[in-house]
Swiss-Prot record, chain A:
The gene is porA. This is Pyruvate synthase subunit PorA. Pfam families: PFOR_II (PF17147), POR_N (PF01855). It comes from Pyrococcus horikoshii (strain ATCC 700860 / DSM 12428 / JCM 9974 / NBRC 100139 / OT-3). Heterotetramer of one alpha, one beta, one delta and one gamma chain. GO terms for molecular function: pyruvate synthase activity. Coiled coil: none annotated. It comes from the Archaea. InterPro entries: PFOR_II, Pyruvate:ferred/Flavod_OxRd, Pyruvate_synthase_PorA, Pyrv_Fd/Flavodoxin_OxRdtase_N, THDP-binding, Transketo_C/PFOR_II. It catalyses: 2 oxidized [2Fe-2S]-[ferredoxin] + pyruvate + CoA = 2 reduced [2Fe-2S]-[ferredoxin] + acetyl-CoA + CO2 + H(+).
């Protein structure tokens, strides 16, 4: 029987890692993710998890150590956040380019400067071009489940790409919620033993990994990484379906909420989806035709799902905790690209919110709604990007 | 003396015509031999057999290795891979190896 208990998302991530039975874990402590490797080291020390726990001197070394272990042919795990993930940046490309199905938990935290330990998604959003699959969890149960799903998708022969699972700093990492720990046997059946066909070391089969590719070969290697990420779309759907069958919890790349007759739909990710759905309930009672959508998968970008969602809305608003300085929020930019060749598109708005841990309140969502309604009334968008919840008195 | 890499070069050249693998893994060991690094050379080791005492130091120190020994134990320089680092000339106790500017 699955155990129903209460825990923080960091603990849920550690439990997910334990259930997946990685052979090597390397990690370096960083707020708000420290508890993940701390808990795992406890599992290893207690003999509950048979794995090598490598203590390293930086996040760059942590990811490098798991790249080495994964290239040797075992299942691996690590966790980090913010500056730590930024320090891993160059090695993230290497993990993807070497097609190593590493899984990493991210306690989504802002980037310096100014230094700030609280939640936004800038750390992992900024890794969107590295070739890592990206999942975002709404709650602690999703943090656990999505890590198991990350292994399932990453290790699929059609994919073979690393995957990261993001969950919001403090809002989830340090908040205790009810979580169901699945049975080990069911997880074992779901994931199976990790048996790499390409990336493993065996003296009887000498190979070179991490090769040099001249201009005559580099593009093809990169194309295969891009192509694998394209193929991941279908594999993710299959994995979600199998997960639901085995564990009874349903996941979708984009989960819609009260969208069927909605004129205005807001899209978000992570824990903000909970706030948004609550707010939609309230606005529905007040007579507004609003809906919500939660993006669980950010890479590969859910192009088809965004197109289907766009068909339902007259105004599509993105509420995101990240900003691509020099343009708009990354989710809005990507969604715009997904819709660019559609003959009919909704009016589109981008709302930058909650950076550096600022609470996203109903009042701020009301502001976004007012801007969306104004666009709907006028039939055009004058300004696509709005920062909501800004303290104008400080500017 | 024939390059000991001849068979590797032939196998690796065959691999080059095969498909790109996931992770750009090279499945044939020794495939780096098809990259003729001798073209990087600025100075070339010139061998003076009359001074050579067959101590093998050049053969031992060559980091490539681009020096192998003929049947009599004299060094043979593989200019396909010798990058002209000059370590052999530096180590040679009888100055039997002289670095001369490469002329192309």
């Amino acid at each position: 029987m699955p155990i129903r208990t209460v825990m923080k998302a960091n603990e849920a991530a550690a439990w997910a890692a334990k259930l997946a039975k990685p052979k090597v874990i390397a990690a370096f402590p960083i707020t708000p993710s420290t508890l993940v490797p701390e808990k795992i080291s406890e599992f290893v020390a207690n003999g509950e998890l048979d794995a090598e726990f490598i203590k390293v001197e930086s996040e760059h070394s942590a990811i490098s150590a798991v790249v080495g272990a994964s290239a040797a042919g075992v299942r691996t795990f690590t966790a980090t956040a913010s500056q730590g993930l930024a320090l891993m940046h160059e090695v993230l490309f290497i993990a993807a380019g070497m097609r190593l199905p590493i899984v990493m938990a991210i306690g989504n935290r802002s980037l310096s400067a100014p230094i700030n330990i609280w939640n936004d998604w800038q750390d992992s959003i900024s890794q969107r071009d590295t070739g890592w699959i990206q999942f975002y969890a709404e709650n602690n149960q999703e943090a656990l489940d999505l890590i198991l799903l990350a292994y399932k998708v990453a290790e699929d022969e059609r994919v073979l790409l690393p995957a990261m699972v993001g969950f919001d700093a403090f809002i989830l990492t340090h908040t205790v919620e009810p979580v169901e720990i699945p049975d080990q046997e069911v997880v074992d059946e779901f994931l199976g033993e990790y048996e790499p066909k390409h990336a493993y070391l065996d003296p009887k089969r000498p190979i070179t990994q991490g090769t040099l590719a001249f201009p005559a070969h580099y593009m093809e290697a990169k194309y295969l990484v891009w192509d694998a990420m394209e193929k991941a779309r279908k594999v993710i759907d299959e994995a979600f379906a199998e997960f639901e069958k085995r564990f009874g919890r349903k996941y979708q790349k984009i989960e819609e909420y009260k969208t069927d007759d909605a004129e205005i739909i807001f899209v978000t990710m992570g824990s903000l989806a909970g706030t948004l759905k609550d707010w939609v309930d309230k606005k529905r009672e007040e007579g507004y035709k609003v809906g919500a959508a939660k993006m669980t998968v950010y890479r590969p970008f859910p192009v088809e799902e965004i197109r289907a969602l766009a068909k339902k809305a007259k105004v599509l608003g993105f509420i995101e905790k990240d900003i691509s300085i020099g343009l708009y929020g990354a989710v809005f930019i990507d969604a715009s690209a997904a819709l660019v060749n559609e003959s009919e598109r909704p009016l589109m708005l981008d709302f930058i919110a909650g950076l550096g841990g600022r609470d996203v309140t109903f009042g701020q969502l009301d502001d976004a709604l007012r801007i969306a309604e104004e666009a709907l009334e006028k039939g055009e968008v004058e300004k696509p990007i709005h920062w909501i919840g800004l303290r104008k008195e400080l500017l | 003396a024939e390059s000991p890499f001849k068979a590797d070069i032939e196998r690796a050249q065959k691999e080059l015509t095969e498909k790109m693998t996931p992770g750009a893994i090279a499945y044939i060991p020794g495939s780096s031999v098809i990259n003729k690094t001798g073209s990087w050379r600025v100075f070339k080791p010139e061998f003076h057999k009359d001074k050579c005492v067959r101590c093998f130091l050049c053969y031992i120190y060559c980091p490539e290795p681009a020096i192998y020994l003929d049947e009599e134990g004299y060094p043979v320089f593989d200019y396909d891979y010798c990058k002209g680092c000059g370590i052999c000339a530096n180590e040679c106790p009888t100055k039997a190896i002289e670095m001369v500017r490469e002329v192309k």
